[in-house]
Every structure is written in C-alpha cells, then in structure tokens.
Amino acid sequence: MRRCAWPLLRLSSRVGLALRHGGAVRLRQAAASSSSSSSGGGGLRAPDTSLFVPVPLKPVEGAAEEDVGAELTRPLDKGEVLKNLNKFYKRKEIQRLGTENGLDARLFHQAFISFRKYIMESSSVSADLHIILNDICCGAGHVDDLFPFFLRHAKQIFPMLDCMDDLRKISDLRLPPNWYPEARAIQRKIIFHAGPTNSGKTYHAIQRFLSAKSGIYCGPLKLLAHEIFQKSNAANVPCDLVTGEERVYASEDAKQASHIACTIEMCSTNTPYEVAVIDEIQMIRDPARGWAWTRALLGLCAEEIHVCGEGAAIDLVTELMYTTGEEVEVRNYKRLTPLTVLDYALESLDNLQPGDCIVCFSKNDIYSVSRQIEARGLECAVIYGSLPPGTKLEQAKKFNDPNDPCKILVATDAIGMGLNLCIKRIIFNSIVKPTVNEKGEKEIDSITTSQALQIAGRAGRFGSSFKQGEVTAMHRDDLLQLKEILSEAVPPVKAAGLHPTPEQIEMFAYHLPDATLSNLIDIFVSLSQVDGLYFVCNIDDFKFLADMIQHIPLNLRSRYVFCTAPLNRKEPFVCTTLLKFARQFSRNEPLTFDWLCRHTKWPLAPPKNIKELVHLEAVHDVFDLYLWLSYRFMDMFPDAALVRDIQKKLDDIIQIGVCNITKLIRASQSGAAPGAAEVMSEGFPLSRTKRDARTVSDHRDAKSAEPLSIALEVPGERRAKSLRTYRSATRQEDLKSHGRGSLANRLLREGLLTQEMLRQLESEWQDQHRSGRYGLASKRNDQSSSKEMGKKKK
C-alpha cells in the first residue's frame, strides 16, 4: 500500500503547485496523466449527464487493516477535514478543471457529495489520501492537492467518464451498411415497385419470388406472411412460415425449404437467397418498427431485392443504396380499379348499403356504431387491432361471403393491410386519430395523407365483386377535410429507423457493469450519432419492460430478449404475466403448460360482456407471448405445441364473442358487469389529449354530467376545424348511444323524466356545445347579476 501511495502524492503536489503558481493552463498538463480520456471530442455534442446514475461507494467501516496513514502522520481531525473539503468545492479553478475532465456542474456536485461523504464516514482512508489531508489541515499543503483523489473517486462512481471515447465509438450509428459484411460482399440488384394500394405492385414482386430458386418474403404482419406462405405452397413452391411465435415447415420431415415467408423482424441477414421481397417499405419511417425495414434493406443477402410500397420512399431508398454502391430500378404502377371520392357524406346510418365499411379510430366508436347498426336490423362484422389474427380472418370471411346476411363492416385502420376485403365504399367515421410524436408522447391529430390513402384504397379491390371503389365521410364537414387530405401529395420519407443491437448493448454493459438496462439504453441513445438519413427509433416500450423486470436477476442477454417481447404495455394482465415468466425463468424453473393453464384459469367460457371479451384478448396475447419466448428459450418454455392448441380453441371462443358483440355491449352498458364502463371507456372519444390529465373514471363521470370542454392545441385551421367537427359528432353519438343508459332509464322508470324532457335535454346539450359556452357564460351572468343585486341593496 505504501508503494502505491507515492505516485499520487507526487502528482497531487504537482497539481497544487500548478494551481498556485501557474493557473489552470499549467494545471491541464499536470492533470493529464490522471485522466485517460475526455468526455468531449472535437465537434461532438456533450452527453446528457442527467442520465448518468452514480454507482454507490460504501465508506470503509472498521479497521480492516492497520491505518498506515495514521501511523505515518496522525489521526485526522474530521472537523478540519470538512472545512477544507468545502473550500475545495468552492474553488473556481477546481470546477473548471473538473469540466475539462468531463464533470459538468451536475456531475461535479454529485461527485463531491459522494467524495465528502466517503471521507467523513470512513473509519480510515488510503495512506496517500490520509497524508495529503493531514498536510492540508496542518497548513503544509493546499486543498488543490485533493483533485487527483477527487477525480479518481468521480470515475469510480461515474465509470463512463473513463471510457467515454469507447462508448462514443460503440454508439456511432453513422455507417449502418458496414454492420452487414455478407451483404456488402455481393452486388445486389434493387427493384422498387412503387404504386398505390390495389395497383398490383406486390403481385409482380411475388411472381418473381415464386419463380426464383430460393427466396424470402418480409412483411409487416403475420397475416401477410401467412398469405404468402399459403399462396406459395398452393403454387407447388415449398415455403416455410417464420413469425415471432412459430415456425411452420412446408415438408413433413421439418426440412428447411428454399423459400421463406416471414415477419420482417424475423428475416435472416446471413442466409443467401436469389430473391428477397420487402413489403410496405414506407414503414421504414415508423417510429417504433422502422429499424426492421432498415435492417432488411441494408442487410439481406440476396441477388435481387424487390421493394414494394409508396413512391414517397423512392428517394430515401435510392440514397441509402447509394451509400452501399447499389443502383435502384424503379417500376411504377397505377391503381387497377377506379376510386371515387363522393360529393356527399353518409350523415346517417340509415343510408348504409351492402359492401360499406365504416372506419373508426377507437374501440368506443366501434362499439357505438356496431350497436346502432344492429338497432336498424342489420348485421355487421367487426375488425380491430387487438383481435387475434384468426378472428380477423373469420370476420373478413363472414363479410366477404355473398351468401352471408352480414353486409356491413365496422373496423379500425387495422384493415389498411393484411386482409383481402370485398368493400364497395369506405366511410370515415372521423378523420382524427391518436398519434405518437417524435418524443413518444400521444397526441390527437388528423390522419395523414398516407394513412387516408392506405385505408381508402381498400374499396373496390381488383378481383372483388365491386369493380370500383368509393370513399366518403360520416359527417358533411369531415368530407371537405377528407377531400383535402386525399388530394395532397404524400410527403417523402426522409429518414430510416435504427435500433441498438444486442451486441452494442453488451459492449456498453462491459464498460458500465453497474448500470441498469434502461439506463444503458438511455446513455446509448444520448451518445449515439446518426447522419441525416437515419433516426433512432422510439424505445419507450423497451425501457418500460426493462424497468419492470430490473429487480429480477437475469443475465444481460436474457434480460434484453424479455424486453423486446412484442406486447401492449397498456394491458396489465399481459405485463404481469411477463413479470411472472421472467421471475420463474430466473429461478431456472420451466414454465409448463399446467402452470400457464393455472395462471390464465383455462379453460375459459365465452364472454358475457365487453370486459370479459377484452380479457380473452389479453389471454390470447399471453399465449402469443409464451410462444414467442418458446422460440427463444425452448428448454424453459417447453410446451409450445400444447399452448398453440388451446390458443386455437381460444380463437373460436373470441370469435363467438365478436359475433355477438352488440349483445356484449348491451350487457356492459346496462351495468351487468362491474367495471364494464371502464372497459368501454378504453377507446374514449378522441378529444381527450395528453394535455388532459383526468383519469378515465373522471372522463366517464364528466360524460354523464355535462359535455367535455377540452382545449386542443392542433396547428392548422383545417385540423382545428376537423377536431371541432369530430368532437361535436362524438358528443351526438354519445347522446344517442349513452344518453339512454342506466341513469336515463332509471329516471324514466321512476317518473322523474319523460321522453319529451329527455329529447329537450339532448337538444339543449347540443345547442350549448354549438354556442361554445358549456356553462361558462351562465356563470358570468350569475356573477354580474349578483353584483347588480348587491349595488341595488346598497
């Protein structure tokens, strides 16, 4: 220990001498040997130090070994030590030197607090530090001599300071093409099939896929991958299906076929193919999943890559391929059937026709519209995002069947891709929907031109019974805005998504072994550098799961896999199940079929209300989660085949519920299910934004009391007008669908309210909304009248 003390003693004396006689300029040279790296390189942005979490450093308790410093000098006077430490902290030269060594004001303060606490609470300190502190207290040294010890302590609690250059190199995302050496080793031919929905662009790419000796199809949805899987095998081209949850072999002996249809996240960048097809390439800009399209485009090892999607992505794909030295051939396609935007809105559900599809952007609207259609004696199919793929296909089959009495479809934008539907007319119930901005915050905004065209293009599909498609809106005011949206050019795709790889996170963890996975990701994104062609995808879902399972002891690779699980974090039951999966996994206890059945209470009965239907959908997601994990940890999730069997049975149960959805809605709204109102409010009207801090229950209470008055800050006159229109329409629908709910019925039964009074209340409610008062004007009138009365009394 004594031999180790002298180098720092000599260095500290040089530091003190430099500060006292040469200032900060000479001090930089003196301290150079104590700093292995600096936090900021030339021209690099400063890291976000608020993400740097200090590593706890416990004070030395008890004399584990003899106190050499006290033997060489004398015991320290802690009072004098504290005074001199505070002097050290206030020295401007020390603060400036800390900045040059990567300690900004925040880190400097945190490091000093930890340094002072360590010295004051330790029963003994290292011999070299003890000698320096003793010299300072005796007047033989200067407080500046503490800087090397302070910097050493700072690097112990902030280990990233000592490896900032390495961390910057690891998180440098400016050359993604270099991540795929196998693809760079061959000269690939890129063919871009550009065109609108229903133009045949994907058909031509698939024909080349089928004629190739080997090929891979990469799609955004399991439904699309399954469709290509079936088409390929039907054409006598053996094709395997690979999704996150399963692998289906074309041959009975489970031998890998030369063709593969997969979801895009599952494509291999190491296997060589003759032809690759990347579908819906415009999703390369998606804030959450865009990285998967970037990875496929840059990394697929195929002689020919056929890219299908909107023409808005042509320029970006061309620029990306320029960086790889590959040229892009563009083939443009036009729509095969005409699509007409009608000059009149639907205005009433009484005007529905066979082949109509009403598009809603919330579950609440789905439920409301479905019940109103049923009240008119019509049957309707229902499709929304959280339904299992099998149920979606069954509902689509029911709607497409010319012999089925179901001629109306009520759906969300989930119909935009993945389903073949015989739709004559698309009717937008609204033109606003929830969106996620660049910061990961949810906002309410008008649908984009790309979204509107994707949905509208489902009408009049080529080969269906309707030779042309029609598009309109539910409300007259929305139709004007819809026409404007559809007439605008789709803005070009400007950047491609990127996501840190497991290898990059592992290298980060090597340098920062005490950091949490969530903190590692934050620091990675903070230090990452991307050029103008790329952006880092939103990682909020990943961080949410990382924080949720942080307390469970898992190795980094397993923890990373659990955090990439595809689940909806808004579903508490699914999140809780993932937590239980991770906990049992950490104990090295296999998650068996029996365990899963006990957890999900299988077997399950058909739903009696909406709340039970939503729970069944969550259970289906849990089965998906089990299958997804079984694909990655086969030994720990051994019963995938059994789970897949009961998942098919659950599909049938959910299908029964969806077929009777109007009965479930009635049961929920009549109060048959406790808590059903909360489920119904899941898709609350879109006038609620992230700026409205009220809870769902507050929203429900407000609906029963008075109309909502929520100020929306949406840029643009068109958006503001469309939001006002939608809010008005939503309230009218709420009046029709909820106004005669349990409270109204009770008042009618008790004789406190008549039908005429109820109609008058509805009329007054709508009039109040149109005037924009919502009780505010009456309140002001009451205040002014009370003042006048007060004056008269005086």
UniProtKB/Swiss-Prot annotation:
Protein's cellular compartments: Nucleus; Mitochondrion matrix; Mitochondrion matrix, Mitochondrion nucleoid
InterPro entries reported in the protein's UniProt record: DEXQc_SUV3 (IPR055206), Helicase_C-like (IPR001650), P-loop_NTPase (IPR027417), RNA-DNA_Helicase (IPR050699), SUV3_C (IPR022192), Suv3_C_1 (IPR041082), Suv3_DEXQc (IPR044774), Suv3_N (IPR041453)
Renumbered residue ranges of the record's region Disordered: 678-741, 764-794
Top enzyme class: hydrolase
Cofactor(s) named in the record: Mg(2+); Mn(2+)
Transit peptide start-stop: 1-30
Alphabetic keyword roster: ATP-binding, Helicase, Hydrolase, Mitochondrion, Mitochondrion nucleoid, Nucleotide-binding, Nucleus, Transit peptide
Name of a matching Pfam family: SUV3_C
Biological process according to GO: DNA recombination; mitochondrial mRNA catabolic process; mitochondrial mRNA surveillance; mitochondrial ncRNA surveillance; mitochondrial RNA 3'-end processing; mitochondrial RNA surveillance; mitochondrion organization; negative regulation of apoptotic process
CDD domains for this protein: DEXQc_Suv3, SF2_C_suv3
Catalytic activity line of the entry: ATP + H2O = ADP + phosphate + H(+)
Protein name: ATP-dependent RNA helicase SUPV3L1, mitochondrial
Organism: Gallus gallus (Chicken)
